[in-house]
């Protein structure tokens, strides 16, 4: 991956991060500015577009997942499965565990209770979706949960030798997306985090297909059909599940 492409992906991360921050902290303010008749019509249009783009931080998350799917596919061109897993573990878990424990200590210091081990252990291992474990870190933990499942899956893809078999891998990702769309939404929650695995996994897969397409590892027609279908699945599911 050349420096120009790395720089572009860094820009995408900055845009994604900015949209997430705007969505969680300033979306109501942007909506108010967009509906304020005292503002110039051009500014109102700009604020409105920004409010829509950052609503719930969803667009930022989509960009993050697209970039992640792309980068992980690139990384696995060179790294073996064991090496890949080891690097992901040491890149994510130490800082994440520190942040979760720090959050618990702060909550305890402010009069809160330390959760039981039945919550702490799945939370620290990022497997809480399988145990109905409440999210930590103000809810942002969910993105790491889905990322870890994606890493496990992609490591297996590498292990069985499909990482460079673009057509087979793309069709596999498409069928997995179709299968996910037919089963019960996962995980079940009462707020924005409802069914995030069901809704956002296709974007990780789209990132994979984009990489395969760029490096001419997949037929472009197969790639286009798969990307359009996976995006359509997201739109149809988000309307059906309606996490907002």
Predicted region positions:
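Alpha-helical transmembrane segments
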Residues: 12-21, 98, 170-177, 227-228
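Structural signature of transmembrane alpha-helix termini at the membrane-water interface
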Residues: 22-25, 29, 70, 101, ...
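Functional transmembrane helices that form membrane-embedded active or gating regions
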Residues: 2-18, 83-86, 90-93, 144-145, ...
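Membrane-interface helix-boundary motifs at transmembrane edges
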Residues: 5-6, 77-87, 111-113, 157-168, ...
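Membrane-interface helix-loop-helix regions
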Residues: 32, 36-59, 86, 91-148, ...
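Functionally critical transmembrane alpha-helices in membrane proteins and complexes, commonly lining
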Residues: 7-75
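Specific transmembrane alpha-helix
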Residues: 17, 58-77, 143-161, 173-220, ...
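Membrane-interface helix-boundary signature
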Residues: 2-12, 47, 51-57, 136, ...
């Amino acid at each position: 991956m050349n420096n120009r492409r790395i720089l572009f992906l860094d820009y995408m991360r900055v845009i994604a991060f900015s949209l997430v921050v705007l969505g969680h902290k300033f979306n109501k303010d942007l909506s108010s500015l967009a509906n304020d008749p005292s503002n110039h019509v051009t500014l109102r249009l700009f604020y409105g577009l920004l409010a829509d783009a950052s609503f719930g931080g969803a667009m930022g998350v989509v960009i993050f997942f697209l970039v992640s799917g792309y980068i992980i596919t690139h990384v696995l061109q060179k790294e073996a499965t064991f090496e890949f897993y080891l690097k992901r573990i040491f890149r994510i878990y130490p800082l994440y565990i520190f942040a979760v424990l720090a959050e618990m200590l702060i909550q305890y210091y402010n009069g809160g209770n330390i959760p039981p081990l039945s919550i702490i252990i799945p939370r620290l291992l990022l497997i809480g979706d399988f145990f109905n474990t409440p999210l930590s870190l103000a809810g942002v933990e969910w993105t790491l949960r889905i990322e870890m499942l994606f890493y496990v899956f992609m490591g297996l893809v590498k292990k069985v030798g499909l990482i460079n078999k673009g057509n087979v891998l793309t069709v596999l990702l498409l069928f997995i997306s179709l299968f996910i769309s037919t089963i019960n939404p996962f995980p079940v929650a009462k707020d924005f985090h409802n069914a995030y695995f069901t809704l956002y996994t296709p974007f990780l897969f789209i990132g994979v297909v984009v990489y395969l397409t760029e490096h001419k590892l997949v037929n472009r027609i197969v790639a286009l059909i798969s990307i359009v279908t996976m995006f359509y699945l997201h739109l149809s599911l988000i309307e059906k599940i309606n996490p907002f």
